[in-house]
């Protein structure tokens, strides 16, 4: 099993879009794929299940932290989903990080080849625990000063987690990149001196969100240009390990 956790302490950086594409890439490669949506907004769940009502239902990902049986939703694409919902805040109130190691063992025992986890930006067990469980933590960000500040906090958290999870791998993914922006290129050069950057970088493309609105990854979206399709296929294949 490979667990990929997508996280950032700043919202609105393309985290959920990446989660959906990683999961759909896994299914296309024949991997038994589970998405764990730990964000109370449940956006990944809504996109993948093609059902806005799913994010208002209890159960789902919350069952991981309890002794309740797991009941993943099987989506039309074939992936399994433990959905996010507004009641997940209660998990942070009653479960500590030490308890989350038990959750890791439970997760590792499940019959999946790939698990992709979407985390909330706020610090708590739903944010920290999945980084302890992961083989790879991916942090998407826009190359601007606000994102760099949040990245510093995220990387500090990852270094703390490495004290109990020495083999943890992390990568930073540049999203919404504008090639002609000198400021962005300077930020990226600075970042590259300190953290491992994942390539290719992602530029802003309307086709990416439009594809998910239709329930398909961008490389299967008829209105996406060839470059966008190839970039996303290469990126997701590299991150899921195949």
What residues fall within each predicted segment?
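P-loop NTP-binding core
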Residues: 1-242
């Amino acid at each position: 099993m490979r667990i990929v956790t997508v996280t950032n302490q700043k919202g609105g950086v393309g985290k959920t879009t990446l989660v959906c594409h990683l999961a759909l890439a896994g299914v296309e490669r024949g991997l038994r794929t589970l998405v764990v949506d730990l964000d109370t907004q449940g956006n990944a769940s809504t996109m993948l299940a093609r059902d806005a009502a799913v994010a208002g239902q209890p159960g789902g990902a919350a069952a991981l932290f309890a002794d309740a049986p797991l009941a993943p939703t099987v989506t039309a694409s074939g992936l399994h989903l433990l959905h996010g919902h507004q009641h997940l805040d209660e998990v942070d109130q009653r479960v500590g990080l030490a308890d989350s190691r038990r959750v890791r063992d439970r997760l590792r025992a499940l019959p999946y080849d790939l698990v992709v986890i979407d985390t909330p930006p706020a610090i708590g067990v739903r944010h920290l625990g999945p980084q302890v469980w992961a083989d790879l933590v991916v942090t998407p960000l826009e190359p601007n000063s606000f994102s760099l500040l949040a990245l510093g906090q995220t990387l500090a958290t990852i270094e703390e987690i490495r004290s109990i999870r020495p083999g943890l791998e992390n990568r930073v993914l540049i999203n919404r990149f504008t090639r002609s922006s000198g400021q962005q290129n300077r930020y990226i050069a600075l970042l590259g001196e300190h953290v491992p950057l994942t390539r290719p970088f992602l530029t802003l493309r309307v086709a990416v969100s439009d594809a998910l609105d239709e329930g398909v990854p961008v490389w299967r979206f008829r209105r996406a240009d060839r470059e966008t399709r190839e970039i996303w296929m290469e990126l997701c294949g590299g991150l899921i390990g195949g």
